[in-house]
Each structure stands twice: as C-alpha cells, then as structure tokens.
Amino acid sequence: QRYQADDAWSWERMALTRARVVAGPPALARRIGAAIRAALGNPEKAKTAIADALAMRLRMLRELPGDGPWDVKLSPGGLVEVEFIAQALQLHHAPRHPEVLAPTTRVALGNLAKIGALTAEEAQGLIAAERLWRGISGILRLTLGPWREDKLPEPAASAVLRVAAPLCASPPVDLPGLRAQMEASAALVRGVFEARLGRLDQGNRT
C-alpha cells in the first residue's frame, strides 16, 4: 500500500487496473480489494495519468512499432491503444468516480461512457475493436504464431476469416475485406486515443 501510494510508476498503476482477487479468505480478499481501489483512486497520481500514458505510448511507437500488418497488439490503433485508453481514463477519473473501475477492459469502457469520459459511440467502437483484435490475435497464435507477411497461408487465412466474421460490422468474405475493416477499426481507436489522451504524430515524438 505504501509503495502504491508513494513510489509506483504510472505503468504499474495502469497494470493494476486489471487486478482482481481470484481466491482466498473473504476477509483478506476484501482487504486486498480495498487496497487496490485506494491505489487506483489516488488523486495526486490521477493528475499525471493521461500525460504519462501518452508518453509511454510514444516511447512504444519508437521502440516497439509493431511487427507486420497482423500484429494487432502493437500496431497503431491496436489492442495496446484500446487498453491504454481504458486504463489511463480509469486512473484519471477514479478519485471522483470510483464506479468506473473494472478489471475487464470492455466493462471499464462502458463505465467510462456512463460518466461521460467517453461518448457512447466511442465506447462501442472501442469495445468492438477490442473484440476483433483479441479474436484475430488468438487464432493467429494458435495457427501461425508471429507473422510478418501481408498474405496469410491456408488454413490460417480461412480460420482468421471464420473467427473475425462475427466480430465485424459486415462479415468479410476475403482477406482484403477483413484488412479494410481492420484499418477502419484501427483508425477509430487511434482517433479516440488522440482525442482523449493526446496526439501521437511525429511532432510529439521528441
């Protein structure tokens, strides 16, 4: 508790938004849950949460820019940016709105929309993108592992399309159609990130 109150870095507190008690004596679980909520609701730390998240993402773009078009975690507008939006906004608003806190990204995004930190349309778009990124990432891990080429081999390509189809607004019939929807989702995520956390253009990468 002392470490979280005084010394924890913002990235550690962002990671703590995902923490949950999964087992243990009820009294201990309540104490741990209360300690997590207190750490995440620190009003002094909240002041720098958004600026720190922006700085971390800028550094990641320099050092870990993503490894090909199917790296839906690290690529611009990918899963990392969805999670950064949810985590940074939770930390920023939790002191006055502890009800936003949730260890599940989708739930947190919905909570943030309820207090006006995101519009309903932004939250819905981010949730849809997060589902799509996790679906694609999961099936690629099972079928190929890291993949740097634009074209996916069979049977991975068919598997990706099957998984992605119900997660897209318009089910794609081929990989170019899926790539177009992925680009639209990435653009939406990047737009919300820059509107809520700050610009990620080259001029800020100093």
What are these regions (language model features)?
Residues Q1-T206:
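A nucleotide- and high-energy phosphate-metabolite-utilizing enzyme signature
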